[in-house]
Amino acid sequence: MNHSRSHALFVQAQTRIPGGVNSPVRAFRSVGGEPFFVARADGPYLFDVDGHRYIDYVGSWGPMIVGHNHPAVREAVQVAISNGLSYGAPCAAEVTMAETIARLVPSCEMVRMVNSGTEATLSAIRLARGATGRNYIVKFEGCYHGHGDSFLVKGGSGMLTLGIPSSPGVPAELSKLTITLTYNDFDAATALFEEMGHHIAAVIVEPVIGNANCIPPQPGYLQHLRTLCTQYAVLLIFDEVMTGFRVALGGAQALYGVTPDLTTFGKIIGGGMPVGAYGGRRDLMQHIAPTGPIYQAGTLSGNPVAMAAGLAMLELIQAPDFYTHLSNAAAALCTGLQQAASQAGIAMTTQQIGGMFGLFFTDQQVETYAQATACNTDRFNRFFHAMLQRGVFFAPSAYEAGFISSAHSPNIIETTLEAARTAFQTIANEAAILSKSETPIKMR
């Protein structure tokens, strides 16, 4: 593929933008090479500035659940724009959005709009600390909750890719207030609560880890956290920035039947536009200004254009059997990829929850962060580039989940699998040649 225009843009970008990108994973540092620059997107496809088309399994990192540039979402945005871009004052759409979230996710009795998932999680832990009068926050290895200082402690996603346990610029004293546990370890959670449960303000968790690829909870694990939090009056926060409206209409909390005290959402509620929200029990949310003393604000919060896009998308995903079709498509993709890898003699495991999936280059199921980091990342990188050359775009990191949209038809899935069969066989052949070249010559 010729990527001359993308290359020129990347060179130019690096003179004005740190690393040439506005979010680290986009730079392809993990997989090698240079990123392509997108010109437009439609349905299941991305089109780059050099004229190449890609089947997209990143979906803007999750929110494009009905595909890119859906006519209903686009029309809603066009209508909203005709009335103005930003008001700095209340509008009807933000009320409708709050009502819609509360109806679809009953644990969110009240909702506050913000501008990103990071802003939502930062606001949620401030609320938790203010409401409980405690300072300690518990998170889990491999979970990523945005780039807030309290979360950059053994963070996942880009932090995993960069191999940095914390970030310069985060005060050591603040990091001490974040306790990190191993996800899916029942005993570790119990031991921590027995030791200092009465000092913990909140436990924040991705109910399905999406930032160390895709790691689901072990049976009963989320309920175990719920029980411990209730026993010690600790707030349980589900970070559903990735799983919200993605793994089920009511999010992971509906799928697993566990009710958190607070929930955070990200860009999916804006149909892909910059937006976030956090919600929860009424008694907790009333601590937020102006009804309470805990301050949080934002000029663009509840932006009318983002609300319009999000409401249109939320309407579409309530169609009958929407999630059944989404899950079936993801299952077909994962089963096909697993079979293609196996036929080529390549160890790979897939894990899938609803329309969210992960590819692990290992022969074992992955339950923890440590197991995710032990996978063969070099082989993933080879697979990533082999698929990209064949017009299929997976996340440019071995530690990121993939996403299916309703625009991924059976034909799109089969096209992907055809590319994968060729890619896996190519990788297997390369490995065989390398192995043969490294075989020592016997001396007589």
UniProtKB/Swiss-Prot annotation:
Q: Any idea which residues bear N6-(pyridoxal phosphate)lysine here?
A: 267
Named in its record, the pathway it takes part in is: Porphyrin-containing compound metabolism; protoporphyrin-IX biosynthesis; 5-aminolevulinate from L-glutamyl-tRNA(Glu): step 2/2
Per UniProt, subcellular location reads as: Cytoplasm
Q: Which cofactor does it need?
A: pyridoxal 5'-phosphate
Recorded E.C. number(s)? 5.4.3.8
Q: Which cysteines are joined by disulfide bonds?
A: none
Coarse class of the protein's main subcellular location: cytoplasm
| Keyword terms of this UniProt record | Cytoplasm, Isomerase, Porphyrin biosynthesis, Pyridoxal phosphate
The record's similarity note reads: Belongs to the class-III pyridoxal-phosphate-dependent aminotransferase family. HemL subfamily.
PANTHER family xref list: GLUTAMATE-1-SEMIALDEHYDE 2,1-AMINOMUTASE, GLUTAMATE-1-SEMIALDEHYDE 2,1-AMINOMUTASE 1, CHLOROPLASTIC-RELATED
- Subunit record text: Homodimer.
Q: What is this protein called?
A: Glutamate-1-semialdehyde 2,1-aminomutase
Task: Give the organism, scientific name.
Answer: Xylella fastidiosa (strain Temecula1 / ATCC 700964)
